[in-house]
Amino acid sequence: MVPRIFAPAYVSVCLLLLCPREVIAPAGSEPWLCQPAPRCGDKIYNPLEQCCYNDAIVSLSETRQCGPPCTFWPCFELCCLDSFGLTNDFVVKLKVQGVNSQCHSSPISSKCESRRRFP
C-alpha cells in the first residue's frame, strides 16, 4: 500500500503517463459550424454587425435615402413606392424577421412626404 503522503504524487504521475501529450483530431477535420453562415452572393457576413441588401453587405447602422425626404435602415426596413395619380408617395415599411418581406404585405413604419410628378 502507498503511504498517504505519496498518494497525490502517484495519481499525478499516472495521469501524466496515461494522457496524450498532443490533441488528437480525426483525419480531414476542420472547424465545424453549428449552422450555415449567412451569405450575400458568394461572400459570408456577420449577421450581428451586417446584413445583405441588394447583393451588397451593409452595416446594421447604415441608412439609405427613401425618396427625397426620407431615410431608412435597409437592414430593418423597406423603402416602398406608393404612387397614386400625380404624386410619388414613399412609405417606409418594417421587414418581418424570418420572412422574405415585401412591400405589399409588410407593416408601415413611417410615411414620407409627397412630391408632385410633372409630365
Swiss-Prot record:
It holds the Pfam family IGFL. It is found in: Secreted. It comes from the Eukaryota. One of its GO terms (molecular function) is signaling receptor binding. GO terms for cellular component: extracellular space. Its main location: secreted. The keyword Transport does not apply. Residues 1-25 form the signal peptide. Detected in cerebellum, heart, placenta, spleen, stomach, testis and thymus. Keywords: Secreted, Signal. InterPro entries: IGFL. Transmembrane segments: none annotated. Potential ligand of the IGFLR1 cell membrane receptor. Belongs to the IGFL family. This is Insulin growth factor-like family member 2. It comes from Homo sapiens (Human). The gene is IGFL2.
